[in-house]
Amino acid sequence: MENFPIINLEKLNGSERADTMEMIKDACENWGFFELVNHGIPHEVMDTVEKMTKGHYKKCMEQRFKELVASKGLEAVQAEVTDLDWESTFFLRHLPVSNICEVPDLDDQYREVMRDFAKRLEKLAEELLDLLCENLGLEKGYLKKIFYGTKGPNFGSKVSNYPPCPKPDLIKGLRAHTDAGGIILLFQDDKVTGLQLLKDGQWIDVPPMRLSIVVNLGDQLEVITNGKYKSVMHRVITQTDGTRMSLASFYNPGSDAVIFPAPTLVEKEAEESKAIYPKFVFDDYMKLYAGLKFQAKEPRFEAMIKAMETVKSDPVATA
């Protein structure tokens, strides 16, 4: 089995830059995931984020989760549960407008810590998009520009805890799916495992590594790269011991951003393939995704192509 790709970003600044860029390229083409070390976010910042996130769960969310489990009788299930996930979550929106001040039960220090962490993640996400541009032969800033729309990108964090589960064989922490958006940066627990990705028909553990950032590609990057890079199915399995922390931050296109395969990539591959992905407004894709998240991505792409063809054939729409 191949080793999960681990990228040392510091090596971009020295003689190993070319090799490091090749590792990123291979990870994007063959894994859809990679793990970053020496990514530039200070360790003390991440330590504080982890400590405060785990403290917030214990103080504000753990008892609520236990009550939810009891109300649904989940500890006594005898068959696989397919309609919910064993996770305790809340969401923070950073861009285009932050909602951190509006989220209940966060103390002021935690709000400030998460606001600072989000700014650092935003910067890292944009740096990574430019590295992808470089590997793809696109002009610097191309992906950021496509994501921008008229109001800027959407950027938010899903803060999750996965408590111990008495029936890990029957209940997933998070059911298998691909991510709808752009590029996702994950700060995960380094002691309790759970995240897996699907590669060559096998579920592979994403190794927990202290103070690393796991990166994965969403559906929009698959479309823009005309399939050169792929979004990959992944899931979270539950454990009988330990609570797993997960902070997934999604750097996505703006709601009105128009997403389509990059013309230069379609031209480069014209002899082998044509543009096989639709052109659509990101918000339209998200509306479709909302009801089909835990299904294969291909029917979503096909539905967007059909919607596009319907618009083209509508004489009113084309007048």
From Swiss-Prot:
InterPro entries: DIOX_N, IPNS-like_FE2OG_OXY, IPNS-like_sf, Oxoglu/Fe-dep_dioxygenase_dom, Plant_2OG-oxidoreductases. It catalyses: 1-aminocyclopropane-1-carboxylate + L-ascorbate + O2 = ethene + L-dehydroascorbate + hydrogen cyanide + CO2 + 2 H2O. It holds the Pfam family DIOX_N. Gene3D superfamilies: B-lactam Antibiotic, Isopenicillin N Synthase, Chain. Its EC number is 1.14.17.4. GO terms for molecular function: 1-aminocyclopropane-1-carboxylate oxidase activity; 2-oxoglutarate-dependent dioxygenase activity; L-ascorbic acid binding; metal ion binding. Pathway: Alkene biosynthesis; ethylene biosynthesis via S-adenosyl-L-methionine; ethylene from S-adenosyl-L-methionine: step 2/2. Induction: Up-regulated during the early stage of hypersensitive response. Disulfide bonds: none annotated. The keyword Lipoprotein does not apply. Keywords: Ethylene biosynthesis, Iron, Metal-binding, Oxidoreductase, Plant defense, Vitamin C. The keyword Metal-binding applies. Fe cation binds at H177, D179, H234. Belongs to the iron/ascorbate-dependent oxidoreductase family. This is 1-aminocyclopropane-1-carboxylate oxidase. The gene is ACO.
